[in-house]
A protein has these predicted regions:
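Flexible cytoplasmic inter-helical loops of multi-pass small-molecule transporters
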Residues: 99-100, 216-240, 510-519
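Central cavity-lining transmembrane alpha-helices of secondary-active solute carriers
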Residues: 41-58, 351-364
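Conserved MFS/SLC helix-loop-helix module at the cytosolic interface between two early adjacent transmembrane helices
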Residues: 50-97
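C-terminal transmembrane helical hairpin of 12-TM major facilitator-type secondary transporters
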Residues: 328-340, 345, 351-356, 374-428
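Extracytoplasmic gate region of multi-pass secondary transporters
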Residues: 18-22, 247-312, 332-357, 361, ...
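Helix-loop-helix hairpin linking two adjacent transmembrane segments in secondary transporters
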Residues: 167-220
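Cytoplasmic membrane-interface "Motif A"-like loop-to-helix N-cap segments
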Residues: 61-73, 316-324, 369-383
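Cytoplasmic helix-loop-helix junction between adjacent transmembrane helices
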Residues: 126, 132-170
Length: 520
């Protein structure tokens, strides 16, 4: 579980490696919001339109967890290397740059629909980076379904929701790591270089590959010791898809997934820039303690301490140890927030996003395992999502002139959004085995990820387009008005809320068992 979580931790960092430096991409590479959003959405383009994710599910069912995990890590590394070269200085002025400038300027059908993965006027570096990100996206989504399948293999009938929640909580620390270190490497030494941030991500993808290989041999050794063959599902048949697609519960869970994740992951890619636009941030004096690079490292170590103590508190049997660790974790979190305020750094403010998730996801997972109520948790998650996006849209801008008030509201809202994000992996993913036959779980997860990927491709692109349309003539990347994109994301939360109520009714009528505990 730890090896799989660490591999996903590295992939989560690379997934959002450019998100906290959107302003620098506009200043140094000429990427406007449309180019940035189009590149970010490209991550899942092949998964959606080449149906790669469906094939990934078939590979997983046929070849097993070990092989598919290593394959996904190799694919991620190839895509990461291409993306690094695309934003590196050596790409500028190359023959490859000239080719991309002159080609991929019109994609039939997509151009007419206004959602083309490439378009005339899109910077060549953004086009080539999008190609690399498409390949990376194939690997990361394959890894996602493989990890879910691996956890089902080891934890079915036991604390499966706790295991999935714990894996996602640890992996999501990658988001915070990315938010802190991507700008750190980009500005290291006083000279801006966006390629340094991506190079940092490439190194981490090499580590993810090593983790996957270690998992391969450890899992094989364990199977040899127990005398079990690696669990592979029955040969894939088209009729299996029919079995999955005829389940109304499956469709409701899949639609909930696409609505919910589309309101979170695309938002992450713009969140730092949104804070830069809505907060009054004054950079500390260059000679002050808070401007030193060492402070970034210290703040990150405190963040890890918050996560470690909060996570560990879930597994203490003695009340004294449990609440003691919890208090220490909260004190460390307050210290982290104070440092973010003193540094006046939008990226370190948003980095608190997964911290509450790390603390409460295992609690929620354990609750679903022993008490149930998965459908109710999905409804609660949707309510929190709506509240947070509307707060960002209408309340946060009111405090733009207030140095303390704006940052305080930002911290609270981001932490609540992170907690709403915890409700989904702890309740949604463990529900899938209740909806489909065990032999097609790999394909079922792949189908859900494919449906989810439609939203993850479309909404980064839409946010970028809406930003450019509602901010005509704005060239300063810290002066955008984010109201319209945030209202759009809140609308997704409303749709998810309605579907949550429908799911609860269907569960009660058909006895799907979503409200029942995983451990009986």
């Amino acid at each position: 579980l730890l090896l799989l979580a660490l591999a996903m931790f590295c992939s989560y960092i690379f997934m959002d490696i450019l998100s906290p430096i959107k302003d620098l991409m506009q200043e140094t590479r000429g990427w406007d919001s449309t180019a940035f959003g189009t590149m970010q959405g490209s991550e899942v383009f092949l998964n959606v339109f080449a149906f790669f994710l469906i094939f990934a599910g078939i590979i997983l069912d046929k070849m097993g967890v070990r092989f598919t995990m290593v394959l996904s890590a190799v694919v991620m590394l190839i895509g990461a290397c291409i993306k690094w070269y695309a934003v590196d200085e050596s790409f500028m002025g190359s023959g490859l740059e000239a080719w991309f400038t002159n080609h991929l300027n019109y994609i039939p059908v997509f151009e007419e629909l206004g959602v083309s993965p490439f378009y005339a006027g899109m910077p060549a570096s953004a086009k080539f980076a999008a190609c690399g990100f498409m390949i990376f996206g194939c690997g990361v989504e394959m890894a996602g379904i493989t990890v879910s399948r691996g956890i089902v293999k080891w934890f079915k009938g036991r604390e499966m929701a706790l295991a999935m929640g714990s894996e996602m909580a640890l992996a999501r620390l990658g988001v915070a790591t990315c938010m802190i270190f991507s700008p750190f490497f980009a500005r290291l030494g006083g000279q801006v270089s966006v390629s340094r941030s991506v190079a940092f991500g490439v190194v981490l993808m090499c580590i993810a590959l090593i983790m996957s290989i270690v998992y391969f041999f450890m899992d094989r050794k364990l199977d040899a010791q127990t005398g079990e063959a690696e669990e592979k599902d029955d040969p894939f048949k088209i009729s299996d898809l029919g079995q999955i697609l005829t389940s109304s519960g499956f469709w409701l869970v899949a639609l909930l997934c696409v609505l919910y994740y589309s309101a979170i992951f695309p938002f992450q890619k713009y969140a730092v820039n949104m804070l830069q636009c809505n907060l009054t941030l004054v950079a500390p004096d260059a000679n002050s303690f808070w401007a030193k690079p060492d402070v970034t490292i210290v703040q990150y170590l405190i963040m890890l301490f918050v996560a470690a103590t909060g996570f560990a508190s879930n597994f203490q049997k003695k009340a004294g140890a449990k609440y003691g660790l919890l208090c220490v974790s909260i004190l460390a979190l307050v210290t982290y927030c104070y440092m973010g305020y003193m540094r006046q750094s939008a990226e370190s403010i948003f980095a608190v996003f997964p911290l509450l998730a790390v603390l409460i996801t295992p609690i929620l997972g354990s609750y679903v395992d022993h008490k149930g109520k998965a459908a109710t948790m999905l409804i609660l998650g949707s309510l929190l999502l709506i509240f947070c996006h509307l707060t960002f849209a209408f309340v946060l801008p009111l405090f733009k002139g207030s140095a303390i008030g704006g940052i305080a509201i930002a911290y609270i809202t981001i932490l609540v959004l992170g907690s709403s994000f915890s409700l989904v992996p702890a309740s949604l993913w463990p529900s899938v085995p209740k909806l489909v036959d065990a032999k097609v779980i790999g394909s079922a997860y792949a189908l859900i990820f494919w449906i989810q990927n439609i939203g993850l491709w479309l909404f980064p692109l839409l946010i970028g387009k809406v930003l450019d349309k509602t901010n005509p003539g704005v060239t300063d990347p810290t002066q955008f008005d984010y109201t319209a994109p945030l209202v759009m994301l809140a609308g997704l939360g409303v749709a998810a809320l309605l579907l949550g109520f429908v799911l609860k009714v269907v569960d009660k009528k058909k006895g799907l068992g979503l409200e029942e505990p995983n451990i009986k």
